[in-house]
Structure formats: C-alpha cells, structure tokens
Amino acid sequence: MSLCCDGAMQKMPAGFYTLLCAQLFSSWADNALLIVVIADLTWRGESPWMIPMLKFGFTLSYVVLAPWVGASADGWKKSSIMWAAHALKVFGVWGIAVGLNPLVFYALVGMGAALYSPAKYGWMTQMVPATRLIHANGWIETATVCSAIGGVVCGGWWISASYLTSLSSLFPWLPFQPTGLSAAYLSVVMLFLVTVVLTFA
C-alpha cells in the first residue's frame, strides 16, 4: 500500500508530457487524414469499394508488421523509430496528394502507425516509474480517444471551402494560396512534423 501511495505522489517526468502531446498530434493527424482521403476519393469519382479498403489496408499493416515491430522497438532508439514512422506517414500523404494509388500509400501511413505504436509505449516505460505506468497509460489512451474525435472534426473542416477562405484571410502574404484539398493534406503533414519535433524535444 505504501509503495502504491508513494508512486501515486510522484510527478510524471517532463518527457512524458512531451510524449503525450506527440501522441495527441499524431493520432489527430491519422484520423483527420482518413476523412481527407475519403473526400479525395469521392471527388475523384473513384469506385465506392475503395473507401472501406482504405481502413482495411491501414489495419492490415498492423497485422503484417506485428511480429517485427515489437522487436525493432526494443532493439533501436525509440526516438529514431518514431521519426522513421512519421517520415513514412509523410511519404504516404505525399503519394496520395499527388494522385498515386491511394490504397498503397494509405497502407504506408498504416505501416508508419504500426511502427510508432510499440516505440511509443516502449519509450513510456523507460521514462515513467513503474508505479506510475497505469496512470501514464490512462493519459495516453485518453489523448488517443480525444484526438480521434478531434481529428474527425478537423478533417471535416479541412475539406470545406471555409477552411480555404480562413487560410487566405490569415496568411494573405503567402506566395501561393492552397487550392482544393492541398491545404488539407498540408495541414496533416504539419501535424506529423509537429509530432517529429516533439519526439526530439
């Protein structure tokens, strides 16, 4: 009992809050991206069956990579794995944005997410005392749920005309103004880049 109480009184290390923010932005971008890609496929006039296949390909990446990603997360520096995971995500977003096969490149985003997940939890166990892991995991899961909701809401706004209008009003000095879904894809990439910065903070 004493150990539990002592652990409950411990403050989380500063690095945990950085990891928490990184998880928030990463999951936020993942969920927003799904909405943006669905809108993109609809506007391109792609076959309706491609929309459910997006999520299938994303999830399949977890299943296929499961035997390897855990061992990789244990054997490599966590921040390096998380950086590589988001580089893969950004590459996937780029491929979709320029019109390449959305199923293939969204699956690459899923691969990035599959790499990120065990590295995130591995890093958490290294920085958080054992007596605080339950609390830390609870905060991570709370951030994930909140970012899933926020990502869907943001994704819906990012594909709207009002978002482009807002960007033009806020940044009239830009040498170019984003059009169509380019602003939405760029916003997703920016969230991934923020996550990378937080990873190395």
Regions found by a protein language model. Give the residues of each.
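Transmembrane alpha-helix termini and helix-breaking/packing motifs in multi-pass membrane transporters
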Residues: 36-43, 95-98, 150-186, 191
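C-terminal ends and interior cores of transmembrane alpha-helices
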Residues: 87-101
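Substrate-agnostic recognition of the 12-TM MFS/MFS-like secondary transporter fold
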Residues: 17-34, 55-89, 105-160, 198-201
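Alpha-helical transmembrane segments of multi-pass secondary-active solute transporters
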Residues: 51, 81, 136, 183-187, ...
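A helix-boundary/kink motif common to multi-pass secondary transporters
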Residues: 46-47, 77-78, 129, 163, ...
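Primarily residues marking transmembrane-helix entry/exit sites
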Residues: 12-20, 48, 99, 103
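Small-residue-rich packing faces within the transmembrane alpha-helices of Major Facilitator Superfamily
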Residues: 90-91, 189-196
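Extracellular/periplasmic helix-loop-helix junction of adjacent transmembrane segments
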Residues: 36-62
